[in-house]
Amino acid sequence: PAFSAFVFKIQANMDPKHHDRIAFLRICSGIFEKGASVLHRQSGKMLRLSQPQQFLATERQTVEKAYPGDIIGIFDTGELGVGDTVCEKKSPVTFIDFPVFPPELFARLSPESSMKRKQFLNGVSQLAQEGAIQIYKQPYIMESFIIGAVGQLQFEVMKYRLEKEYNVTVNVEPISYTCARWTEGDVPPEELIGLDNAMVVYDRRERPVYLLPNAWQAGWLEERNKDVVFLQSPPLGVARLEGN
């Protein structure tokens, strides 16, 4: 069988001195060989996995070959995200996305100093790709992000890591929204009725997300748009094997 694997974890700053990022892959089929060029299904790009490693406590060991069930770590420059698929170009496969818990708390995240904007954007981008917290963008706003979490502790961890790992002090300001809705299929926001009390943001896959003050407002939005299927969490991709 052809090689395939999926990214189940990304960890930034495993070596704090170098701000490295390690993407952990689980091999699903075929044999992985060091230096292999693979297809990244989400971007369509070819990636060369030249420095695969396995980890045992604080020790790292270079991997020459890996087999189904094995876990390897590769250095990532920001191309990969949790749930992404890599495979051989001749036998493309895409695995289903990881399910995401619906956020219940939302806040605006911004740097205290505009002089730290570069570190702020870099830190937010890297931590977002770990999948530990949901980060949303507002159209035309680059000075802040909207973050969504299941519990307050996630906000505190995000703030701590930005300060300690990226040297940027941030403000976390709660906003008065308690639920989010995605839509099934490609439905532009301008086609929806009743967004007066909603905040429209975009997730890491550039899908529109509607933040609402409460469940009643969410229900009212759904009632006004009966031909649209609303989801409480991001829509999952469909696993598929192509070219066979």
Regions found by a protein language model. Name each.
Residues 1-244:
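Structural and coupling elements of P-loop NTPases
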